[in-house]
Amino acid sequence: MMRSGNPYLNDDSFGFGTGQNRMTLEGVANKTMLLLGICIFTAFVSWTTITVNPGLGTILFFLGIIGSLAAAISMWFIDKRLAVYIGPIYAAFEGLVLGPFSGLMEAYYPGIIVQAVGLTFGLFFTMLVVYRARIIKPSKNLAIGLASAIGAIMLIYMASFILAIASPYQIPYIHGNGIVGIGFSLIVIAVGALTFVMDFDFIEKGVEQGAPKHLEWYAAFGLMITLVWLYIEILRLLAKLRSR
């Protein structure tokens, strides 16, 4: 069975549904839109709060970091049927993080949010067309390569975070606006975009194989993870380019 590059979406999640209890493309799309709506709403709330009350806004920001990480990690271990609860919780907490982060970027580089949102969804729909046209075909080798790349990127993120917290040092160049920093962001965005191909394949196979309907929430959660990741990386790339 093929595995998705997204650590949350893989064929091991499949069960079998019956009749109206089966997973559908429309169901996944609707639930993904709902999660995005929740995220956008809480992002607006946190962004507005931090401009009026910076202290409370900062508390919401760190609460969002802790809550979204806890929700994302718990999704690996819990019964997938609980995704109907964990998904919206994750989206709400993630919005608390994205609001202040996006607001800070917008303060430094006016118009950057609109650019980042446009590029994120533009990339999403481009990869959907690429997938439907089978220009890039999902394969076991692609899944393994993406999983390895995502693992390496996560290790770099973790090492960078630990160094920033525990020492005055950081991993050189990757956060800067030089060639290496911009190149790193482009690589991360490319990996994230290719992850969509495997995610779409997971969802399509789930529908074809009659996966249970509760996996619509799980699939929507997986897509949400990728969309948020891409948005943040595109925002960072645009900031690097505009700071040159």
Give the positions of each predicted feature.
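A hydrophobic alpha-helical transmembrane-helix feature that marks the membrane cores
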Residues: M1-R244
